[in-house]
Amino acid sequence: ALALVHHLAISSNVPLPMIASTFAAMSPHAVVEFVPKEDAMVRKLLSSRRDVFPDYTIEGFREAFGERYQIVSETPITASTRTLFHLRRRD
């Protein structure tokens, strides 16, 4: 789910736990890109609205997705603020 989570969370106000539950219902494995608020794209999304997303942090992502998935790996993307997560659903 590359370039998807920040759009669902910031643009559509979908809470991270709901995103994690939806992904877990669809697939036992996931590769998810976390894009932090410091990223230019998220700053652009937030420029036209009030930031009402206190849980939209990498820690909040780990917590929300960690309830449904085991974090297999977490890889910072070089020359970027973004991080790729390889996830395996908890059964």
Describe the predicted segments one by one.
Residues 7-9, 38-43, 82-83:
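Short catalytic/ligand-binding loop motif for oxyanion handling, primarily in non-cytosolic enzymes
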Residues 14, 45-51:
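Short secondary-structure boundary/capping segments
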Residues 1-5:
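A short beta-strand submotif of the Rossmann-like class I SAM-dependent methyltransferase core
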Residues 19-41:
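Conserved beta-strand signature within the Rossmann-like core of class I S-adenosyl-L-methionine
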Residues 7-23:
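A short, conserved alpha-helix within the catalytic core of class I
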Residues 72-91:
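Core SAM-dependent methyltransferase catalytic element
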Residues 26-30, 70, 83:
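A short pocket-lining beta-strand/turn micro-motif at the edge of beta-sheets
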Residues 51-72:
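Short alpha-helix
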